[in-house]
Amino acid sequence: MSSTSLYAAIDLGSNSFHMLVVREVAGSIQTLSRIKRKVRLAAGLNSDNTLSAEAMERGWQCLRLFAERLQDIPPTQIRVVATATLRLAVNAEEFLAKAQEILGTPVQVISGEEEARLIYQGVAHTTGGADQRLVVDIGGASTELVTGTGAQTTSLFSLSMGCVTWLERYFADRSLTKENFDLAEAAAREVLLPIADVLRYHGWKVCVGASGTVQALQEIMMAQGMDERITLAKLQQLKQRAIQCGRLEELEIEGLTLERALVFPSGLAILIAIFSELNIQCMTLAGGALREGLVYGMLHLSVEQDIRSRTLRNIQRRFMIDTEQAQRVASLASHLLSQLDGSWELDPLSRDLLLSACSLHEIGLSVDFKRAPQHAAYLVNNLDLPGFTPAQKKLIATLLLNQTNAIDLSSLHQQNAVPPRVAEHLCRLLRLAILFASRRRDDLLPAIQLAAHDDQLTLTLPENWLAEHPLGREMVDQECQWQSYVHWTLRVTSGDTPR
């Protein structure tokens, strides 16, 4: 592999140090490695903002690991930035001099506003959804809030509060009491107050979180089978659970890793304050943040309007998927869905996810025809799909698993991107679109009429179509049977003759 295609971004954060190494492939990035170490630099700041020798040593120790990996990468393709703690520390120069010596490359201490801008760029390049967004990143010693549309930011703020500093300030006794949470939330709201009106003025259609706290929340909700949207009600539930645990060392929540537990309550308190103060309805996890912003900045890649479409095109090219057939199936699925508008109300996101599944439905053939749906589900579950959240990936994988043959109803109910009934509806539409497009020619697609009464589907085919297409008739009969096994009613008529 040519080293000139390699890029590295290192973020010396207040809680963790991160390194991202990527390879540029045809205008997009392929992640080669991610290394993260909990350094808790902010915990080493005293009341005079002097960084302790122990904290500096923890940081240098981590950088020695990173340095080994950087030897393979041209210096012009490496960016190392330091954030809140090293902005604050009065003896930052001492740490930075040795850090640069260890890494053999300059370390740039970036301003809070520049950090916010880079975070937004990382989100814009990797996260799907509406263009107008609010981005929230809770770090160890600072919290960034950014509004923007497309690639352009409209307001940028970096606030002096973070999960490590709030831990030391409001949970220093390690007690998870209502009083400690109330103090932490009130302090966070006070910090937010001067900027709240500006953020509300610029507005947003979607809110995304790009921090360890939000990642932890996502993992908790996935583990507990909840849908992936973070809401204030869910945050309050988790706060009550933390209070029940009593002490930080006894904090146990299903899905919360030991590594994230220490700063989880303080991050949770800050997030509750942000939700309350800004009246946020729901938040999802961003696909990238500061490090991705650094990498895309080095590559000078423009932000695409539709990240999901770019991802699907890249995957189709990589796995040599027949794009004409994928489009044929997607067009048919869209046509079938449009006929059910009055009866099956699917929101625009559900429709997009159905069409994404259509785009990738033959990916399993790149492994083998035998067990192709299982191969497809495995690949989608394990591929990096910028623009899609973990729950959305799981839904697409589940739809592909159930695209033909026997239906695994439990898998459709276990995904958490959409309600189970919606997943069933998407699955039925995908199966019918694949079945009727199987001849791989537009001129052979029958004029299908589809109607729904609750969960009963009635499929009307042109007169004599079944008689003239014996294989097609057999496939339709088999599909009716597969659907009946999971108590889905599919009634087929040909002209005026019901079957």
Swiss-Prot record:
A GO BP annotation: guanosine pentaphosphate catabolic process
Any one Gene Ontology molecular-function term assigned to this protein's record: guanosine-5'-triphosphate,3'-diphosphate diphosphatase activity
PANTHER family (alphabetical): EXOPOLYPHOSPHATASE (PTHR30005), RETROGRADE REGULATION PROTEIN 2 (PTHR30005:SF0)
InterPro entries with a match to the protein in the record: ATPase_NBD, GppA/Ppx_hydrolase, Guo-5TP_3DP_PyrP, Ppx_GppA_C, Ppx_GppA_N, PyroPPase_GppA_Ppx
Gene3D superfamilies: 3.30.420.40, Exopolyphosphatase. Domain 2, Hypothetical protein af1432
Keywords: Hydrolase
Name the UniProt record assigns to this protein: Guanosine-5'-triphosphate,3'-diphosphate pyrophosphatase
Group of enzyme by EC: hydrolase
Superkingdom in the source lineage: Bacteria
Enzyme Commission numbers on file: 3.6.1.40
HAMAP family: GppA
